[in-house]
């Protein structure tokens, strides 16, 4: 679910109106390592791929059954509907293009395998997350119109994360693929502007001549593209949502602070106004002694 960072008592109130849903898939050490530790499948990379293919085959048959039912019912036949399966309904949503795949993948060979599988079953991959070998996969990512969502300089914490370079994000961008900055670290994710600056600097040191205006797209327009929302957010243009951050200095400076945040044209944060700053809806009934 894609959320907007707005005040609400419920997740439903934060949902981005009309945004497509997303589904995470994973390949590599995480599924095989976790499931293997429980003596469950998939415990190898091969079984992981086999399990995915089996699931897509099952979803394809499930979709065919419902398509046949709808066609028969529309023709006036008195026919009972197939049984519902919420797991397969989710996969059918992917096959019909309503749910976007975000694929956890590190290595180029597994990205290639996932692309092959998407072609076999006729769905699209929105993005590969982590993609520490994105610089190797960049041409195939550009051809398939798949974003790579990457760290600036985080690697080496497990075997499949070893073969990264600091120029990873810059090289993916240089090859005209969709490069996106990210982090699942609780500190780095608060300073993605600085992560962009690090990745841009690495690219410039090798002579790629990346401008700040291009680099900032890694956190804005390209990120919106990975969510299927680049027609509404990610850049300042007529007809798009008025989502704007005003910085105290250059956005990529380590000294820069977000001064104001506007979402949908409304001021949602103002560093100089305590009444327009984040508050929690937890413990509202508890009186704190003055």
Identify the role of each PLM range.
Residues 1-127, 257, 263, 288-289:
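Polyanionic/metal-chelating signatures
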Residues 5-7, 107, 132, 152, ...:
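A mature extracytoplasmic/lumenal domain signature
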Residues 87, 110, 134, 164-165, ...:
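Amphipathic coiled-coil/heptad-repeat helices and related helical stalk/stem segments
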Residues 100, 139-247, 267:
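His/Asp/Glu-enriched, well-ordered alpha-helical/loop segment
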Residues 108-112, 131-138, 188-190:
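Active-site environment of divalent metal-dependent phosphoester hydrolases
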Residues 123-130, 147-152:
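Short hydrophobic/aromatic-enriched beta-strand-loop microsegments
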Residues 225, 237-282:
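C-terminal cap of metal-dependent C-N hydrolases
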